[in-house]
Amino acid sequence: MSTVLGSSRQAVDVSPFTRLPDLALRTYGGAVVAASDESFAEREALIRPGRPEFRPHTFGPKGQVYDGWETRRRRGPGHDWAIVRLGLPGIIRGVIVDTAWFKGNYPPYASVEACAAEGHPSVDELSGWVEIVAKSPLSGDAVHEFPVADPRRFTHVRLNIFPDGGVARLRVHGEVVPDRTFLDGLTVDLAALENGARVVSCSDEFYSSPNNVIAPGLARHQAEGWETARRRGGGNDWLIVALAGPGMVAVAELDTANLIYNAPGAASLSGIDARRASLDDAGAWFPLLPRTRLQPDTRHRFRLDDVRTVTHVRLDIYPDGGLARLRLLGALTRTSDPITFD
C-alpha cells in the first residue's frame, strides 16, 4: 500500500523508512545502468540528490526541460523501465517514486523489482528479479511512498512504468548490508555508512541530517554535513553512531569542512559496548577523546589510546554547530557480528 503526499514541493516525510539512507543515491555510488528509453530526459536524473527543480517555459531541442527521466510516447505494446545499481547494497525498507513537475506526462502506474548479484555483473547478467512493489497507480506531480517488507539483501532495482512518461526521482531507503569480505581482518572506517554503520540518535538535526557525517566521500558544501540549530540555553549537541560491528578504534577524524562560521568550538568522543550495557547507562560510557578544541573548515585527526572494544560511539560537540564527516578507523574484533537494530 502506498502513501501519496501530493506535491513534491511540500517536503513532508510520512513513512518511518524515509529516515533511513537512500541506497540508490548517486553521491553514495548509485548508477542508472540501463533504461528502455530516455528520449526526453536522461535516466541519470532519477538518483540525483536534492529535490527536483523546474523552470517553466525552458525549452530545448526535445521540448520542455525536466529534472527527471522521461520516455517517448509509446505507440505499441510493452512498457518502459530503468535499472539502478545501488551504491549501498542492503535491505530495502521502502521506495519513493516522485513525479514532481510531471503533470500531463506522468506514468499512470509503476512497479519496482529487485535482485541480488555478486561481483560486478553486466546488465545482461542480472537475474532473479523479485517484485518488491506491486503495480500501483501514480498521480502527477506527487510523492508516492511504498513500504517494502522483503528482508533480503539486494544490489539492484528495476523501476517499471506503465506504459511511458516521466519520473523525477527514485528513492530506495533501507539498511546497508556490506560484503564482510572487505571488512574482516582489515583496518576500516567503523563509522562508515557504506560499511554498515548507522546514526541511531542525535540531539538536533534542524539544518541537515546526522546521517551525512558518516556518508561516503567529502562534503561539497554545508548541506552535505550535519548542522544543528543555535543553542540559546545550556547543554550541547550530540549524536550516537552504531558501528559496523564491535571493534577497536585507533584513529578518529573530525572534519569541519565548509563550516567556517558555524563549526563547534570543541568536541569529544565516548564509547560503549552495548552488548554488555544499555546506551541509557551513562556510567557505562568511557572516554575515547577528551574535549578538544576544533578549528573551522579543517580536517582533524587524533590517535586514540583506549583499546577497549566498542559497539557505539557518541560524538559531543560544544555547544552546537556542525560537522562535515566523522571517520573512526580501526578493526572489527574477530568474533564481530553486524550490530542489529530494533
How should these model regions be labeled?
Residues S2-W81, E175-A244, I260-N262, L332-D342:
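Disordered, acidic Ser/Thr/Pro-rich linker "stalks" and the adjacent N-terminal cap
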